[in-house]
Regions:
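Extended catalytic cores of very large enzyme megasubunits
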Residues: 1-228
Length: 228
C-alpha cells in the first residue's frame, strides 16, 4: 500500500497515511459526481453530499468498503482532475476495423491507454484494409515533448507515414528527461528516451520492407506488441 501510494503524499514528506488516502478518494469521488451533476443541469444538494461524504469516509477508513485498487491509487489526484479519468480504468478495447480511415490514431490511442496503466485488448479486423507505404521523410525536426502525449504523438506520426505515406520528420529526443528522473504527473521515474528510440526503430524495421503490401493480422499484432 505505502509503496504504491507514496507519490501522492500531499505534503511530499513520504508515504501517504491511510486517513489521507481516504480523504483524497472520497473528495475525488464527490468532486467528480458534482461535476457530472452540473454537466447534466441537475440540482446539487451540498448539505446532503457533505453528510454522505462523511459517512463514506468513515466507512472507508474502517474498511467497511473500499474502491478498486486503481481508485485508491488515482482517485482525487491532479492527474485525474486535469487529464480526464482514464487513469481509473482497468481495461479497454479498441477494434482495428476502421484502420483504413483512422490509421495510426488507433495505435496511438492504445499506446496512450497503456501508458496510464490500462490493459488494452484489440482485434485484427483491419488486416487487408490498407497498403503499407513508404513515408515521406523530411529534413524537418520534431522535438518530442517530455510527456506521455509527446511520446504518443511521435508514434502516431511515424505510423501515419507507413499507413498513408504522410510526412515523417526527424525525431529529436533531447527534451526527454534522463533515466531515473522523477515523473510528477503519474508517479515513478523516467526510463529516459531509450525505449522510445527502440520503439521507433522497431516499427520502422517492421514496415520499411513491406511497401505496397497489404497490412496483415500479424503486422497488427506485432505493432501492438511492440508498443505494449
Amino acid at each position: 500500500y505505502a509503496r504504491r501510494l507514496n507519490e501522492f503524499d500531499p505534503e511530499a514528506t513520504g508515504t501517504e497515511e491511510w486517513w489521507q488516502t481516504c480523504r483524497r478518494v472520497v473528495e475525488g469521488m464527490f468532486n467528480m459526481q458534482k461535476q457530472h451533476v452540473f454537466m447534466l443541469g441537475l440540482e446539487w444538494n451540498d448539505a446532503k453530499a457533505q453528510r454522505t461524504a462523511k459517512d463514506a469516509y468513515d466507512r472507508l477508513f474502517n474498511l467497511k468498503w473500499t474502491p478498486p485498487g486503481r481508485g485508491l491509487w488515482m482517485m482525487g489526484t491532479k492527474f485525474v482532475e486535469e487529464r480526464t479519468a482514464a487513469g481509473l480504468f482497468n481495461c479497454a478495447f479498441r477494434s482495428t476495423r476502421d484502420l483504413a480511415t483512422k490509421g495510426g490514431y488507433l495505435f496511438a490511442w492504445m499506446m496512450d491507454a497503456l501508458m496510464v496503466g490500462i490493459g488494452v485488448g484489440f482485434d485484427t479486423e483491419g488486416a487487408g484494409t490498407i497498403n503499407i507505404q513508404e513515408p515521406q521523410y523530411t529534413n524537418d525536426t520534431l522535438v518530442i515533448d517530455d510527456s506521455r502525449e509527446g511520446w504518443v504523438d511521435s508514434v502516431h506520426t511515424l505510423l501515419d507515414g507507413f499507413f498513408s505515406g504522410a510526412k515523417v520528420p526527424k525525431f529529436d529526443y533531447s527534451a526527454i528527461r534522463p533515466e531515473g528522473a522523477l515523473i510528477h504527473g503519474f508517479g515513478g521515474t523516467s526510463s529516459g528516451a531509450g525505449p522510445l528510440i527502440e520503439l521507433h526503430e522497431s516499427l520502422s524495421a517492421l514496415f520499411s520492407e513491406k511497401s505496397g503490401e497489404l497490412i496483415s493480422s500479424v503486422d497488427i499484432v506485432d505493432t501492438e506488441n511492440l508498443i505494449g
